[in-house]
Amino acid sequence: MSATRIGVVGAGGRMGRMLIEATLKDDRLVLGAAFDVPGSPALGKTAGELVGLPCDVVVTDDVAAGLKNIDCLIDFTRPQGTLVHLELCRKAGVGMVIGTTGFEADGKAVIAEAAKDIPVVFAPNMAVGVNVAFKLLETAARILNQGYDIEIVEAHHRLKVDAPSGTALRMGEVVASALGRDLEECAVYGREGVTGERDPSTIGFATVRGGDIVGDHTVMFCGIGERVEITHKASSRMPYALGSLRAARFMAGHKSGLFDMQDVLGLR
């Protein structure tokens, strides 16, 4: 099988650099293109310069032109930009891995529609460990379905713009689904003042933002006399990059369809 050609959006950012590095170190992949926004200091540099590895792919802001050189575009940017890139990929017949979070319902609907024409892997967290945690949460919620209060605590760096994180929300969705509940109806986002006694049917969320925390997520099942916690902590962004590249390789066997990391990892 020939190497999968990867394109990276946001090449000059922290996640973009990590994706470039991971791609260049994987002999099953080829970096075909690297993109960044107009005005970025990364423009005109080679991807190799950004990560200190041999590579002569030049960073450009012309995504439409660069798509002809790739099989899969990986995007960890902002919802508005991601949807623009998605439409370009759809027109070019190029698959897409979307790690961007913070989409509203209408944005998710656009992604689902595009996946009728191209393969799309869309997941709130690409790390393999987090997706194993999703599976563990499903099992735990079904067993601890009576007498346990459920709280989700997440922490990220000071620059993260959405809260709760997409991963925390997905954890809540997994737990709520296993319990036969609708997260939109049972979620409580933060507490303040005299809140009254806790409603046992709710799922609570707490958010921490500070420093350079890459990503910590804990789901607590709080019973009487015991507490079960399922935690994932990321110490670098490399797990997200490696999971994204695994998703890109997975897409090589699909012409269209909407997938997530549970599909990629065979956890369905």
Swiss-Prot record:
EC code(s) of this entry: 1.17.1.8
Main location: cytoplasm
Catalytic activity field: (S)-2,3,4,5-tetrahydrodipicolinate + NAD(+) + H2O = (2S,4S)-4-hydroxy-2,3,4,5-tetrahydrodipicolinate + NADH + H(+); (S)-2,3,4,5-tetrahydrodipicolinate + NADP(+) + H2O = (2S,4S)-4-hydroxy-2,3,4,5-tetrahydrodipicolinate + NADPH + H(+)
Active site as annotated: 156, 160
UniProt similarity note: Belongs to the DapB family.
Binding site for NAD(+): 10-15, 36, 99-101, 123-126
CDD domains reported for this sequence: DHDPR_N
Protein purpose: Catalyzes the conversion of 4-hydroxy-tetrahydrodipicolinate (HTPA) to tetrahydrodipicolinate.
Name of the gene this protein is made from: dapB
Pathway assigned in UniProt: Amino-acid biosynthesis; L-lysine biosynthesis via DAP pathway; (S)-tetrahydrodipicolinate from L-aspartate: step 4/4
RNA-binding among keywords: no
Binding site for (S)-2,3,4,5-tetrahydrodipicolinate: 157, 166-167
Name of the featured protein: 4-hydroxy-tetrahydrodipicolinate reductase
Listed GO MF terms: 4-hydroxy-tetrahydrodipicolinate reductase; NAD binding; NADP binding; oxidoreductase activity, acting on CH or CH2 groups, NAD or NADP as acceptor
UniProt keyword DNA-binding, yes or no: no
GO cellular component assignments: cytosol
One biological process term in Gene Ontology: diaminopimelate biosynthetic process
InterPro entries cross-referenced by the UniProt entry: DapB_C, DapB_N, DapB_N_CS, DHDPR_bac, NAD(P)-bd_dom_sf
The entry's keywords: Amino-acid biosynthesis, Cytoplasm, Diaminopimelate biosynthesis, Lysine biosynthesis, NAD, NADP, Oxidoreductase
Localization annotation: Cytoplasm
SUPFAM superfamilies from the UniProt entry: Glyceraldehyde-3-phosphate dehydrogenase-like, C-terminal domain, NAD(P)-binding Rossmann-fold domains
Top-level division of the source organism's lineage: Bacteria
